[in-house]
Regions:
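N-terminal intrinsically disordered, low-complexity, charged/polar
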Residues: 1-7, 89-94
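Short capping segments at the starts of secondary-structure elements
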Residues: 6, 15-24, 115-120
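Short glycine-rich, basic-tinged beta-strand/loop micro-motifs
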Residues: 34, 112-133
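Charge-enriched amphipathic alpha-helical scaffolds
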Residues: 36, 41-61, 126-163
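Long, low-complexity, charged/polar intrinsically disordered regions in eukaryotic proteins
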Residues: 44-97
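An N-terminal amphipathic alpha-helical segment
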Residues: 91-120
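C-terminal edge-of-domain segments
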Residues: 158-177
Length: 177
């Protein structure tokens, strides 16, 4: 379940996608600290300063991503030259992008200042994250995320549903319960 907790990278990615100003970013992080501490990575639950510093670091990365990405091969060469090893796969999970969707959905609904729901078609959700069909493992992961983030999927007229029962082109509406 550790991979479902909010990391600084997750928070920065969500904030970047929301295109918030500096004060709005600070307010957003303050709300997360006050209300979502149970969902924060364990290293941040008692250290607000570290959470803000690490999130700010990643926000800086996203603001100048092309330049920093251009330097990545040099960092890898330096690590190899000094006998070190950079294991990028240690920082991702099989469903990292999909996890970020559910994390973002919860935070946008609760603190985005707009709608109290997120909606999209099942086809869009699957296509956006590179899936072509609902496998049992993917469904298990969907249900795990929905349960963990206290989200409930609905179809039209606020009828509760299960994602696998929704038609591929039907709109799914997620709300925090």
């Amino acid at each position: 379940m550790e991979e479902l907790l909010y990391s600084a990278l997750d928070l920065a990615a969500i904030i970047s996608s929301m295109d918030l100003g500096c004060r709005a970013q600070a307010n957003f992080l303050e709300q997360i600290w006050e209300n979502e501490r149970a969902f924060l990575w364990s290293g941040y639950r008692d250290n607000k300063r570290q959470m803000i510093l690490d999130t700010s670091y990643w926000l800086t990365y996203f603001s100048d991503k092309p330049t920093i990405d251009a330097e990545f091969p040099m960092i890898q060469r330096d690590a190899q030259a000094t006998g070190g090893e950079l294991l990028t796969e240690n920082y991702t999970s099989d469903y990292a992008d999909l996890d970020l969707f559910f994390k973002s959905a919860r935070l946008r609904i609760l603190y985005g200042g707009g709608k109290d729901y997120i909606r999209l078609k099942r086809r869009t959700l699957m296509k956006r994250y590179g899936y072509k069909r609902m496998t049992p493992l993917l469904m298990e992961h969907f249900h795990r995320c929905i349960y963990f983030y206290h989200l409930q999927p609905f179809v039209r007229d606020r009828v509760e549903c299960r994602i696998e029962d929704v038609d591929i082109d039907e709109m799914i509406i997620f709300r925090v319960i």
